[in-house]
């Protein structure tokens, strides 16, 4: 008989951890999830992309998600603070104001996706459903239990120190999965965390009841899209996400220095930012704020390693950049999906050395690299993003990214084309789009981590 309590201990019961537990439990792997909070709890990151659909179907939770009656998300839209004509620079299919854009997810077929929509979710309810589902499949789930430390003895032998109030318990496992989100428990413990060299984002957000979503669009069929409103403030935008029929999540995302240099409280900063979009500001003021403002900092970081002897990092515990394209839950679910395959094989082979997880390492680094480069190119020249969305030559390639379909292991050529155009704009101060360049520098094609 094994002297291990579990094959795998999973730190964190958010979407990454619960999805990992579901895959492992379905495969007969003895696993336990330790979540320091008691669900339900509030959490940001409320809009999904279609790349989450195959995962939700595979682990068998989709029916429960559907019964929760979360708003359906058929598409996404981006609105501009600018007005007036602009040179189209040879792009095709652009309308009179191509600084705005919109997409329907069903314009492009995606493997494993069986519907035209995904969901906007109340993360408190969504995360609880996923965690309870993992338990129903046979994973052990412990809430209100914090992991204080992890001791790596040898590949296949790990001691996890768990705390419940003043009581400490040692748990023996063959390996650990860090799904602790932005707490990045193992990343800090092992000295793996690195601050992102480009991003230093900051968000302020709340929920509003009876917000008039028609203020963002004249099309009734689009009121339940996610809306991203560009603001005239550098590197600043607003999300607008339906949560229920009447409640809308609204948040301002900016570079942290924009906030710290303002001498405003974060609530004052929120209102000053949205004031630059009159329709949005007026609609928010006419609604009822039903949650206190919350701020999210420490947004952007990476890890020097995402796996090693007896450990794997997934979801936000592995990487987080920026929420502009709703990538967070998709990265959580897909990193769990990819890593679970390696872990199941490691358990079968009783081999928990780093080499057992190299498939996951390559796949997730490539997928997140695609997200990262897409996001940085957007911030460098967002008028180029909206031009590519509208141009039929590039629309489906951009839609692939917006669907979250980035885990094929292949290089996405559309990113090279965007980079090429940005380089031309950067090198020519007389270029008609030069004035739209953001102040974030596009990194090399191969990130440092």
UniProtKB/Swiss-Prot annotation:
Catalyses: (1H-pyrrole-2-carbonyl)-[peptidyl-carrier protein] + 2 FADH2 + 2 chloride + 2 O2 = (4,5-dichloro-1H-pyrrole-2-carbonyl)-[peptidyl-carrier protein] + 2 FAD + 4 H2O; (1H-pyrrole-2-carbonyl)-[peptidyl-carrier protein] + FADH2 + chloride + O2 = (5-chloro-1H-pyrrole-2-carbonyl)-[peptidyl-carrier protein] + FAD + 2 H2O; (5-chloro-1H-pyrrole-2-carbonyl)-[peptidyl-carrier protein] + FADH2 + chloride + O2 = (4,5-dichloro-1H-pyrrole-2-carbonyl)-[peptidyl-carrier protein] + FAD + 2 H2O
Which Pfam families does the record cross-reference, listed alphabetically? FAD_binding_3
Q: Which InterPro entries match?
A: FAD-bd (IPR002938), FAD/NAD-bd_sf (IPR036188), Flavin-dep_Halogenase_NPB (IPR050816)
Name the UniProt key words of this record, in alphabetical order.
Answer: Antibiotic biosynthesis, Chloride, FAD, Flavoprotein, Nucleotide-binding, Oxidoreductase
Keyword Nucleotide-binding in record: yes
Q: In which pathway does it act?
A: Antibiotic biosynthesis
Q: Could you give the domain comment from the record? A: Contains an additional unique helical region at the C-terminus. This C-terminal region blocks a putative substrate-binding cleft, suggesting that a conformational change involving repositioning of this region is necessary to allow binding of the pyrrolyl-S-PltL substrate for its dichlorination by PltA.
The protein's name:
1H-pyrrole-2-carbonyl-[peptidyl-carrier protein] chlorinase
